Regions:
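Generic short N-terminal amphipathic or hydrophobic helices
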Residues: 20-21, 42, 80
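Mixed-charge, Lys/Arg-rich low-complexity intrinsically disordered regions
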Residues: 1-20, 24-28
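Intrinsically disordered, low-complexity, charged/polar segments
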Residues: 61-85
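Intrinsically disordered, low-complexity peptide-like regions
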Residues: 5-9, 57, 73
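Basic/aromatic-rich interaction segments and small domains that mediate binding to polyanionic partners
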Residues: 24-68
Length: 85
């Protein structure tokens, strides 16, 4: 579900501009300020000019770039995904 939504966001033919995701961080605590096991409301955008995903918390406090869908999916477990945040 998560990988599919990210790939759709990355697709140049997609009309989806961003995703709003409720997810639990499964990466290492301290990585860009995120805490393992903590749930976050995220806004994810794919920046074509940089070739990467940019993830920020809805409140704008935390930010992390990801080069691939695999890298993002490795660090997050999504419980809800909504297009067009």
């Amino acid at each position: 579900m998560l990988t599919r939504a990210l790939n759709d966001l990355k697709n140049p033919k997609s009309k989806t501009v961003s995703l709003q995701i409720i997810a639990t961080f499964t990466g290492t605590t301290g990585s860009m300020g995120f805490v393992t096991g903590q749930r976050y409301e995220l806004i994810v955008r794919y920046i074509r000019s940089r070739g990467r995903f940019e993830v920020k918390t809805r409140d704008g406090q935390l930010f992390c770039p990801y080069q691939s869908t695999e890298a993002f999916a490795k660090n997050w477990s999504a419980s809800a995904i909504q297009k067009g945040a």
